[in-house]
Amino acid sequence: MKRIEEKEKAIMDEIMEMHALAEKAVELSFRAMRGDKSVVREISRIEQQTDVLDTDINYACTTFIALFQPVARDLRFAISIMRISSSYERIADIAQEISLYESKLPEIVFKAEKYLKKMFDAVKEGYTKTEGLKERMTELDNAVDEIYVEAIEQLEESCDVNAVLTVRHIERIGDLLAKIAARQIFIKEGRRVWII
């Protein structure tokens, strides 16, 4: 294995750790929304881990660019991975914020959990295979968006700011996962796509 491939593998190992941490934070945030506030401390710990990992990944990618002066796919990899890492870190931040809110949420909000889980699964698969990823993520992101719209309509008269923020944050997690998928396609195929 060439040094450049070894470095890419090391960076990818950290990205997969970020993926797992962000997914766990989101899973725990749904438990917190259901009233289990015992998970708040664990989400906070995960959020701190993602902060450190994001810094490590950005440093590793910057070093990768400086040492190897990559072109084409390798350059797309380094630049895109930094942005992907930041998206995972932001997802963990959002999950932490959600866990701190106290509010009564419409039941439809909890349907978003299964779609976000499917989005995480699709993104994980996207590191090895991007065929059909755009279409799959578009469909899942649209499902989360529809839940957001319906939940906001149900919350219109309640004036529950925490509930509105929670719903908005859930929709934002879907958007961030869609952006990660778009960057995966850019790395593999060299083309820019928008998943909206």
Swiss-Prot record:
GO terms for cellular component: cytoplasm. GO terms for biological process: intracellular phosphate ion homeostasis; negative regulation of phosphate metabolic process; negative regulation of phosphate transmembrane transport; phosphate ion transport. It comes from the Archaea. Pfam families: PhoU (PF01895). It is found in: Cytoplasm. One of its GO terms (molecular function) is protein homodimerization activity. Its main location: cytoplasm. Keywords: Cytoplasm, Phosphate transport, Transport. InterPro entries: P_transport_PhoU (IPR028366), PhoU-like_sf (IPR038078), PhoU_dom (IPR026022). Plays a role in the regulation of phosphate uptake. Belongs to the PhoU family. Homodimer. This is Phosphate-specific transport system accessory protein PhoU homolog.
